[in-house]
Amino acid sequence: MKHNLILRVIAKYLFPVIALFAFYVQFHGDYGPGGGFQAGVILSVGFILYTLVFGLDTAERVLPSGILRLLASTGILLYAGTGVATMMLGGNFLDYDMLAANPVTGQHIGIILIELGVGITVFAVMLIIFFVIAGRGRT
């Protein structure tokens, strides 16, 4: 599919739309359906589309495996760090009320941080799995 001009043009225009929808799902998850897991899956599927059209080597140059591992661990640290921060502020693990003076604001901040951590981790892990499976048989 690397040499198909129509696919390349469509993929170049479609990826930003997919990414924008993923960010919408990510940040709308606090107020309605959606959240980190769904956004991570949508964003990774957009990048998988890019990989299928432009090739695995090109995709790995754009997003190397070291960056993906860093993103996966950053998401986990964000999730765990939010929980540890709430404990250090005198609450229970992931007791978001402690994150702000107003408990409702604290809930919103906590949920956004947790969902962001989940989204980053899901995005990175799905791409790591895809790259490993897609790269089998290469020498």
Regions found by a protein language model. Give the residues of each.
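Short aromatic-rich membrane-water interface segments that cap or initiate transmembrane helices
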Residues: 101-116
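Short juxtamembrane and helix-loop transition motifs at transmembrane-helix boundaries
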Residues: 1-7
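Hydrophobic cores of alpha-helical transmembrane segments in multi-pass inner/ER membrane proteins
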Residues: 45-51, 114-128
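Hydrophobic alpha-helical membrane-insertion segments
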Residues: 69-85
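Transmembrane alpha-helix boundary signature
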Residues: 55-59, 83-98, 128
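Short, hydrophobic/aliphatic alpha-helical segments
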Residues: 12-29
